[in-house]
Amino acid sequence: MPHPMVAPALRRRRRSSFNPHVAAVMTGSILAGAMLSLSFIAVPVLLDTTTHPPQLFHKWSRLYHYGHVVLPSTAILTGLLYIYAAVCHHQRSSRSSLYLAGYGAQQS
């Protein structure tokens, strides 16, 4: 027979270590960093390295292509994580509008 203090601990359900609030903020931060790096780093480098219009157009189109592949899916994932965090929080309390407001501010 197990010790009386161990039995309640064994009956407790183990909580998941996944925190949707942290995941939403992290993916939003990564997305914001990626967009800022494109604006503040990649575009000036493109303009400094070449002035030949066809080559500049080719580099810009490749940069747009890579951003088009990655960034929209990251934005959708971030939005879904904010919604999931709001739903999880709403199940525990009634202040889920703060997370939805955070998602709305991040998308605008």
Swiss-Prot record:
Its EC number is 1.10.3.-. It is a multi-pass membrane protein. Keywords: Membrane, Monooxygenase, Oxidoreductase, Transmembrane, Transmembrane helix. The keyword Kinase does not apply. Secalonic acids show unprecedented anticancer activities against various human cancer cells and might be interesting for further derivatization, targeting diseases such as cancer. It is found in: Membrane. This is Anthrone oxygenase AacuG. It comes from Aspergillus aculeatus (strain ATCC 16872 / CBS 172.66 / WB 5094).
